[in-house]
Structure formats: C-alpha cells, structure tokens
C-alpha cells in the first residue's frame, strides 16, 4: 500500500512537470504577432559592446524570451551594381570560414528575388558558403542569444532606395514574432569631429522616423542607407520609434583620432 502511494505521488510530480513544460512551450511559440527592430553594426572593434547589446535585447527587452524569426538585413558589399534586394534561394547551412548556420529561404516564397547566380551564397558541396563577414559576426551572437530563432537573410543594395517599396508590401503582413536587424556601420574615413556631427544627424533622422527618400539619403551617413530605410519603413508601419543605446567609433574606442581609418557605430532599438 505504501509503495502504491509513493508511485502515485511520483506520477503526479511527473505529470506536473510535463504540464509546466507544455505551458512554457505554448507561451514561447503562441505569443501574438509582434515586430521588433534593432540596428547593430558588423564592425567588430570592441566586439564586447556588440555582445552587450545582444544581451540587452535578450534579457531586458525580451525579458529572457526570444523572437520566433529574425530577418537580418545587410548591405551587398561585393556587388555594388546590384539594384534589387535579394534573399537565399533554398534553405541550407551557410558557412563563413569554418563557421556554419542554417538560413531559411521562406522569404523567397514571397517572390522576393533570390540569389540564383550565387553571387552572395556560393554552392559548396551540399551546402553554401559566403564571403560576407556580417554572416558570422551576427550568426555567432544569434546562436548564443537567440538559438531557437529561424534566420531569414535580406541582402540589400546600398543606395538604390527604389528597391524598398515592392518588398515592403511583401513583408508587412507576415504574421510572425519577428526581430528585424539592420547590420549597418555608420560614418567612415573622417576625423572624429566630422564623424560625430554626421552621426548626430543620422541619429536625429532615425529618431524622427523620416521616410522622405531624398532626405534619408542626404542625412544618413552609413554603409547601407537602404538597409536602414527598409527597417525604418517597417518600424513606422508597426508604430515603433528608434531609441539610441550606444554610439562609438574607432577613435573613441582607441582614444585617439583615427582620421581616415575612423568608422563609427550606432546601436539602436525600437519601442
């Protein structure tokens, strides 16, 4: 009789554990559709600050949860004549050097042009490889902080704003819990005084939610204004406004004016 009672208690405990785990899983994957946005650089001088920002997103903004999907927007560094936004053609493991992460091709189902010529994602045995360093810089942190999230890459021309309008209508109605990251570095090749002035104008423009295309190009000093314009347009549709978290540069990090070797970084999140 005593053994039977102990067995019953054990089963009750196991049942409660299963119910709690099911509840956690349900809460994790059945939240209402939500869009979140962040601007994170891929210039990795003082990479600890990038980790610090990811940690802020994970533990303060998401409060320990994580998005279901991540759209990672990055400039097309090596094919500057490309005028269209592209994504990956098939879901596959993508390698950068010796590091690998799976990317999803689900955005190509929305008739977003995919990289058929292998300019960005080159066939490599049964997988793909890339020379775009933003892949690994963000992958290793997404693996660490948002390991469950499915990643959708968007590779954008840097200055062809006309590429944005058609993709906006395809993305805006997605019923996902999404974090949209624009992987962008800001002012380059200027002394720190000029860099700071340009960054202040960029920050003001992003905070003001400016969507005038000509003004955006004139006022944003970054390696991919189109990446920022796409993110800004989506954020505006979702009534999210930019907040500055950090701003630094090669000069402030190294505590000396780097002049032509200067690159600035701006970390922003939207609420």
Where are the predicted features?
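Charged interaction patches that mediate protein-protein contacts
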Residues: 1, 268-270
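N-terminal Sec-pathway targeting helices
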Residues: 2-17
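Active-site histidine-anchored catalytic micro-motif
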Residues: 20-255, 259, 269
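Short beta-strand micro-motifs in enzyme catalytic cores
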Residues: 264-266
